[in-house]
C-alpha cells in the first residue's frame, strides 16, 4: 500500500476520491475485507490521530502483512477517506410533521457529537470532502427536512451551508480548546482562567474586558450547552429567512 501525505496522488485521469472509482474484482477469496481494515483504522485513529497512523501498524493489528491491505485500499489517503465515512452519523430521522427545527438540530447535534468523539475527522474533512455513502445520506436527509419545511433555493442552499459550517466550525473550536488545555496539563476551565489576564493585557483596551469575561464564561459552560445555544440562534434565523421571497 502506498503511504502519501498529499491529496492528489492518483494517476492522471483517475478520480481522486475512492468513491468515484470502481471496485476491483476479487479473483480469489481474501482473508481480509475492506470493512475490517477500515474499522481497525478508525480504532488506531482514535488512539493516535492521523499523524500516528502507520500502514504497517494497521497490518500488525490485523495480523496481516502490509501488502495484503493493498488489494482493498490502494493508498493511505483512500483509507482516511473511508474512515471518515465509516464514523459519519446516521441521517436524522424526521419527527412530527411541521417540527422541522427539531429534526435539523438533531442532525447537527449528531454530527457534532461524532466530530468530538473522533476529533481526527475535523482535520481530514479539510482535505477529504465527505462524499461517501453515509455522508451523502446525512446531507440528503437534511435537505429533505428543509424542503418539506418549505425552504426553496437560494434560501435552502444558504440554510444547508449554515448548518454544516456552524457544526464543523464549532467542533473545531471545541477540539482546539480541549487540545490546548491537555497540552498544558490543566483542565479546560483552569486553562481558560489563566488565559483571561493575558487577554486583558493583549487585546485592544476597548475590547479587553468583554473578551476576558467571555473567556471566563466559556470555561464554566459545558461544550454541549455552548453548541446547543448557538444552534438555537441559527435555527431562529433560518425560520425568519424561510419566510423571505425566493
UniProtKB/Swiss-Prot annotation:
- Annotated DNA-binding ranges come to 54-73
Keyword field? Activator, DNA-binding, Repressor, Transcription, Transcription regulation
Pfam family of the protein (one): TetR_C_1
Q: Does the keyword DNA-binding apply?
A: yes
User: Which GO molecular function annotations are given, in alphabetical order?
Assistant: DNA-binding transcription factor activity; transcription cis-regulatory region binding
Q: Where is the HTH tetR-type domain?
A: 31-91
Induction (record text): Negatively autoregulated.
Highest taxon in the source lineage: Bacteria
Activity regulation summary: Activity is regulated by the effector molecule D-arabinose, which binds to AbrT and reduces its binding affinity to the abrT-SLCG_1980 intergenic region.
**GO biological process: any one?**
negative regulation of DNA-templated transcription
Null mutant phenotype reads: Deletion of the gene results in increased lincomycin A (Lin-A) production, but delayed mycelium formation and sporulation on solid media.
**Is Transport among the key words of this record?**
no
PROSITE patterns referenced in this protein's UniProt entry, alphabetically: HTH_TETR_2
Function summary = Transcriptional regulator that plays a pivotal role in regulating lincomycin production and morphological development in S.lincolnensis. Exhibits opposing regulatory effects, directly or indirectly repressing the expression of lincomycin biosynthetic (lin) cluster genes and directly activating the expression of the morphological developmental genes amfC, whiB and ftsZ. Binds to two motifs present in the bidirectional promoter between abrT and SLCG_1980, which encodes an arabinose efflux permease, leading to the repression of the genes.
Name under which the protein is recorded = HTH-type transcriptional regulator AbrT
- Organism of derivation: Streptomyces lincolnensis
Amino acid at each position: 500500500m502506498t503511504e502519501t501525505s498529499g491529496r492528489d496522488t492518483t494517476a492522471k485521469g483517475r478520480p481522486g476520491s475512492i468513491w468515484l472509482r470502481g471496485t476491483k474484482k476479487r479473483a480469489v477469496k481474501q482473508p481480509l475485507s475492506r470493512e475490517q481494515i477500515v474499522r481497525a483504522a478508525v480504532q488506531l485513529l482514535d488512539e493516535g490521530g492521523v499523524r500516528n497512523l502507520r500502514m504497517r501498524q494497521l497490518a500488525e493489528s490485523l495480523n496481516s502483512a502490509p501488502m495484503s491491505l493493498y488489494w482493498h485500499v490502494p493508498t493511505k489517503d483512500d483509507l482516511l477517506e473511508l474512515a471518515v465515512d465509516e464514523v459519519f452519523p446516521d441521517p436524522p430521522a424526521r419527527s412530527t410533521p411541521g417540527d422541522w427545527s427539531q429534526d435539523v438540530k438533531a442532525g447537527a447535534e449528531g454530527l457534532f457529537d461524532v466530530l468530538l468523539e473522533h476529533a481526527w475527522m475535523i482535520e481530514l474533512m479539510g482535505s477529504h470532502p465527505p462524499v461517501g455513502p453515509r455522508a451523502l445520506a446525512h446531507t440528503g436527509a437534511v435537505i429533505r427536512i428543509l424542503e418539506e419545511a418549505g425552504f426553496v433555493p437560494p434560501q435552502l442552499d444558504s440554510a444547508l451551508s449554515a448548518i454544516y459550517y456552524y457544526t464543523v466550525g464549532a467542533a473545531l473550536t471545541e477540539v482546539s480548546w480541549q487540545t490546548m488545555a491537555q497540552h498544558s496539563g490543566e483542565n479546560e476551565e483552569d486553562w481558560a482562567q489563566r488565559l483571561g489576564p493575558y487577554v486583558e493585557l493583549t487585546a485592544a483596551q476597548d475590547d479587553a474586558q468583554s473578551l476576558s469575561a467571555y473567556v471566563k464564561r466559556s470555561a464554566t459552560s459545558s461544550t454541549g450547552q455552548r453548541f446547543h445555544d448557538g444552534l438555537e440562534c441559527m435555527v431562529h434565523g433560518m425560520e425568519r429567512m424561510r419566510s423571505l421571497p425566493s
